[in-house]
Design a protein with these regions (language model features):
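Membrane-interface extramembranous regions at the lipid-water interface
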Residues: 1-23, 27-57, 103-126
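Hydrophobic alpha-helical transmembrane segments in multi-pass membrane proteins
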Residues: 9-29, 56-102
Length: 126
């Protein structure tokens, strides 16, 4: 398989990650799962690495954004303005950070280089 095809799949994985965060939550993740099921991806190390990173980062993003925001609201109460302030600040900070990491991952995929998400990205087994 050509390096261009491998780079294209890596770029697609990073683009779907960003689409999951910015444009179509859920649909982008389904696209990542569909891409993971493709038979040609395991043979392509760069595409496999980017796809694995984006899948794990998407799962962490769901836990960090939805799970912890809901926990803050449940603990603080839905009527408390301080709970909403905390949720808005928390969500804005983490969402921006995840998008920024996705942009760096996309630029690395476009350059044909590997990328690991800081803190939440899995380490390569190879």
């Amino acid at each position: 398989m050509s390096p261009e095809r491998e780079r294209f799949l890596a770029i697609t994985a990073e683009s779907l990650y960003l689409a999951n965060l910015l444009l179509a939550p859920g649909l982008g993740f389904l696209g990542l799962l569909w891409l993971w099921r493709r038979p040609d991806v395991p043979a392509l190390p760069l595409a496999r690495q980017h796809l694995r990173q984006t899948l794990v980062a998407s799962l962490w993003a769901g836990v960090l954004l939805v799970g912890l925001s809901a926990t803050i609201l449940l603990i603080g109460g839905f009527e408390s303005m301080w709970s909403w302030l905390a949720v808005i600040l928390y969500f804005t900070f983490f969402h921006s950070t995840l998008v920024l990491c996705g942009m760096v991952g996309l630029s690395r995929a476009m350059a044909g280089q590997p990328f690991r998400f800081p803190l939440i990205g899995p380490r390569d087994r190879e």
